[in-house]
């Protein structure tokens, strides 16, 4: 199969029949909300408010949600027509050709590798902070990644990624049940923060709501709000993890749109509420450099016990995110192996009809990144790779509509206001990508060069055999 040759819909559908269709709308809502409302809601709002937007950070969240919403609608339609493992990779391979599908999938693979490592490291840092008052302190060699503050391996990051892989290895239904339990706790903690935080809001902290723009620092005005969008967009990318597991959905024509759109709507409401309460409790400048603004704001307001409880539940939230990312990433690796673009072993199922090799490959790579190497400078790569995949998917809606009822099934859910909304989704994703810092775009370029080299040196050659 050449770069431009389109993949066969029937082959993909038949190849994925081995998956057990066990995931319900509730499972997808739990995975989606758990992945979206994870590390970001407890870390980003204060930093973006202090660095870019002031109280106007809520507009950054809403604008990011608007762009993500356009893309989510496209994902919902795609997943009802093609409920395949691999999500964007499989869809783009069918619509535009294998080579373009590989580029989209390679972009998402960067997201999963780095995001699993990123969340694992965040889990480690928060757990160490939570246990410090109890006198628990790891030796530096086991507390930090290699070369960071005397560290050799971040042992907690290693163990939590390993645990998430074991749970996913047991099956998607087990992961879904655990996610449902943990996501309820996390949403309850967020709501508790909102209710308590409202009682200590000082209206003066909202003035001016949109601070004047400072061209020297980039702070304030619409420019500051848009700079916040590029940083915050990372918070909304979790709905791709739902689509990546669509091969395991019960009645995907109904469960997929409900899971994707529902999880995003819940996330938007919670993000906006937390952000408004946070900047109302204390001056936005007080959150500068603060990686745990929610817990800090509660402590400073005299709610130390609730602060500890929220931090503990935040850890549960990060664990849900790990489950979602490992689930989705392993299915993407399976799809690459299924099609011969990566070693065929990744495309094999075990006796329980699970892509075990994909699960362990993802876990091992993420452990190496998160436990042994400092990776903070790669964080924006998560957004960069995902945004490129999002652009492919929104453009793919035009090809999908032309082929529905011909060589592809009719969608049971269709993106509204066609052809305007797909275009807005593409343009919005492009603008957010353009707003990323230069290093993120540079590193994403290097990642894609590596991917293209692998495709022509290995994947394309294997496909021809």
Swiss-Prot record:
Keywords: Amino-acid transport, Cell membrane, Membrane, Transmembrane, Transmembrane helix, Transport. Induction: Expression is repressed by the transcriptional regulator CodY. Disruption phenotype: Deletion mutant shows a strongly reduced uptake activity of BCAAs and methionine. Deletion of the gene results in the loss of most of the BCAA uptake activity of L.lactis, and deletion of this gene together with a second BCAA permease, encoded by brnQ, further reduced the viability of the strain. InterPro entries: AA/rel_permease1 (IPR002293). Pfam families: AA_permease_2. Its main location: membrane. GO terms for molecular function: amino acid transmembrane transporter activity. The keyword Ligase does not apply. It is a multi-pass membrane protein. The chain crosses the membrane at residues 28-48, 56-76, 88-110, 149-169, 181-201, 219-239, 259-279, 309-329, 359-379, 380-400, 416-436, 438-458. It is found in: Cell membrane. GO terms for cellular component: plasma membrane. It comes from the Bacteria. Branched-chain amino acid transport system that specifically transports branched-chain amino acids (BCAAs) (isoleucine, leucine and valine) and, to a lesser extent, methionine. Important for CodY-mediated regulation, and required for optimal growth in media containing free amino acids as the only amino acid source. Belongs to the amino acid-polyamine-organocation (APC) superfamily. This is Branched-chain amino acid permease BcaP. It comes from Lactococcus lactis subsp. cremoris (strain MG1363). The gene is bcaP.
């Amino acid at each position: 199969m050449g770069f431009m040759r389109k993949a066969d819909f029937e082959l993909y559908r038949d190849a994925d029949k081995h998956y057990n269709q066990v995931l319900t709308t509730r499972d997808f809502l739990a995975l989606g909300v758990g992945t979206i409302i994870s590390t970001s809601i407890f870390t980003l709002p204060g930093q973006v408010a202090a660095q870019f937007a002031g109280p106007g950070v809520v507009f950054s969240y809403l604008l990011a949600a608007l762009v993500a919403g356009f893309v989510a609608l496209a994902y919902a339609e795609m997943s009802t027509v093609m409920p395949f493992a691999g999500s964007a990779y499989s869809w783009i391979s069918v619509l535009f050709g294998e080579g373009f599908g590989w580029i989209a999938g390679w972009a998402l693979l960067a997201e999963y590798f780095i995001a699993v490592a990123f969340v694992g490291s965040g889990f480690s840092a928060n757990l160490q902070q939570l246990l410090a008052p109890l006198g628990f302190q790891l030796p530096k060699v086991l507390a930090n990644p290699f070369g960071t503050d005397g560290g050799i391996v971040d042992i907690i990051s290693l163990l939590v990624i390993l645990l998430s892989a074991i749970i996913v290895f047991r099956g998607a239904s087990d992961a879904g049940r655990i996610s449902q339990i943990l996501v309820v706790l996390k949403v309850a903690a967020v709501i508790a923060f909102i209710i308590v935080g409202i009682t200590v809001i000082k209206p003066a902290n909202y003035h001016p709501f949109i601070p004047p723009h400072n061209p020297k620092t980039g702070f304030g005005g619409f420019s500051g709000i848009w700079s916040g969008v590029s940083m915050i967009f990372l918070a909304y990318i979790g709905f791709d993890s739902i689509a990546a597991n669509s091969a395991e959905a019960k009645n995907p024509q109904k469960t997929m749109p409900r899971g994707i759109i529902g999880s995003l709507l819940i996330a938007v409401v919670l993000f906006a509420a937390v952000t408004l309460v946070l900047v109302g409790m204390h001056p936005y400048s007080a959150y500068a450099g603060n990686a745990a603004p929610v817990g800090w704001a509660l402590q400073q307001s005299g709610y130390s016990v609730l602060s500890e409880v929220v931090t503990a539940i935040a850890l549960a939230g990060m664990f849900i995110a790990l489950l979602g990312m490992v689930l989705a990433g392993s299915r993407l690796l399976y799809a690459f192996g299924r099609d011969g673009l990566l070693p065929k072993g990744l495309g094999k199922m075990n006796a329980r009809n699970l892509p075990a090799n994909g699960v362990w490959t993802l876990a091992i790579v993420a452990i190496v990144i998160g436990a042994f190497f400092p990776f903070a400078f790669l964080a924006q790569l998560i957004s960069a790779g995902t945004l490129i995949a999002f652009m492919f998917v929104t453009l793919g809606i035009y090809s999908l509509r032309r082929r529905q009822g011909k060589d592809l099934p009719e969608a049971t859910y269709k993106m509204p206001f066609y052809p305007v909304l797909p275009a807005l989704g593409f343009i919005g994703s492009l603008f957010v990508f353009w707003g990323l810092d230069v290093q993120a775009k540079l590193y994403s370029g290097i990642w894609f060069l590596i991917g293209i080299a692998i495709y022509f040196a290995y994947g394309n050659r294997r496909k021809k055999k």
